[in-house]
Amino acid sequence: MMMKKIFTLALAAVLAGTALASCAAKGFDKDGAITVISREKGSGTRSAFIELFGVEVDDEDKTVETADITDKTNVMMTSVSQNANAIGYISLGSLNDSVKALKIDGAAATVENIENGSYKISRPFNIATKSDLSETAKDFVDFILSDEGQKVVEDNGYIPVASTGAYSGSKPSGKISIGGSSSV
């Protein structure tokens, strides 16, 4: 088994609770049932949500048995945006005007509140690699951690880490395989 290195990017991809949350929201029925929407097993967003909210018991998700399950961030957002009585969760970088992020303990889901710790529901994104990277893969990681790479992170609604300076890679040609969260 090959050793893996983990580069922690404190991107703090926030799990912003999404909902049309106000009783004044158009179509909200304060006496109606709340539709809980969750992600599929194996979703990193789901894993972080159940851990952060303390609803994981003996490695099992105890959110609610009747939750509607979605398999992608955009499906979660569409499901919530089309049902005024629905609630779900996404990463901050995915948040747009179709859904509303809920306040947690009175704190809004903002980059500033995540960085100062008042919005407590956040998680880092990580880069996991094999111990021996190809020149192309190493160059890609160098780009991600550079000023230019962290600007891409920030421009996409996530929280950048301290960069390693300007990108000065060799720009090799080659192929790398990337997999992981649909939140990124």
Language model feature labels by segment:
Residues C23-V184:
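Exported/periplasmic ABC-transporter solute-binding proteins
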Residues A13-G17:
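Alpha-helical transmembrane segments
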Residues T18-S22:
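C-terminal motif of bacterial Sec signal peptides marking the signal peptidase cleavage site
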Residues M1-L11:
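Positively charged n-region of N-terminal signal peptides that target proteins for export
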